[in-house]
Every structure is written in C-alpha cells, then in structure tokens.
Amino acid sequence: MTNTVLISQTVAILIDGNNIERSIHSESKSEKTMLNIDTLIPKLLGNRSLNRLIYFREGLKISSKLAERLHQNYHGSVRPCHKSADIPLSIKATQLSAKVDTIIILSGDSDYIELVRHLKSEGVRVEICAVKKTTAAILEEEADHYHPITNEDWFDYSPAKKKRSRKKSEN
C-alpha cells in the first residue's frame, strides 16, 4: 500500500452506515456509541478537497439531525437503502469514479472487494476506513490505503432528557 497523497486530490467519501454502526457497537460494547463524523472526516481528508459525502443507511428511520448536520457541515447527504447499502454504494462509487481522484469507503465488508478492484482499474485511488477487528483482511490488502477507526473516532451518545413541564394549579 502506498501512502502518497497529492494535495490537489478530490475525494468522495461513501459511508456504509449500518456496517460502521454495527462495527462500532461491537467494538465499544454499547448501542449508544456513534461515529464522530466531525473529527473523522477532516482527518480522512487531510489537505484534500471533498467532492461528495454520502451516508448510506438501511431502513426508513434516518435521523434528521444526522442528515442536517452532514448537509450543513459537508454538503453531504443521507441515502436510505431498501436493504443493504452494498449495491447503492457500489453504483454511486462507479458513477463518481470519473469525477474524483480518490474514493474513501467507510466499511470493512468484504462484499466491496470487487468494487475496490474495479475502481483501481479505472485509475481511482481507493481508501478503506473501518474498525480493524471487523475489516476483511482482503479488503485492507487490496485498498491503496487503510484508515483504522479507533475509539478516538466515536463517542457515547446520551440524549438530553426532556424536562417535564408541570402545569400550574389554579386555586
């Protein structure tokens, strides 16, 4: 794996949300753990420019706060997927391959190995970012660069408890 990065590179970041969430929950042993996108994305980009950021998420229940935050901070979006994110993410990566220099895939799923090989054959630099324990070795080896997600890249989310309002009793 080479680690040469050109400063003028344009980057697309494609996140398999369900895969990353399951990996982080498994590693942290907590369902309340969330990926800290605000620290991870700048770390992944370095001095490169972000062209696209898309968070693929299975299901219809998608946090509007996440979608809003991605849009405000990175002009990113959340794409709901019917089942797994594998196919929609692969299609989008293939579509973007002519528009970017580098594609960073946040997933350790070995299902992406053929996508990685295809993108590399098209001249795209492919980087994988995932939790080490849940990353397929073949995916890590095939990528041009591997970024491990560590406990520094997530946080425990505890929603603020709503205060119960008491009605004032009238005498």
Residue locations for each model-derived region?
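Domain-level signal for Mg2+-assisted phosphodiester chemistry and nucleotide/NA-binding surfaces
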Residues: M1-A85, Q95-A98, R125
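Nuclease catalytic cores that cleave nucleic-acid phosphodiester bonds
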Residues: G59-N171
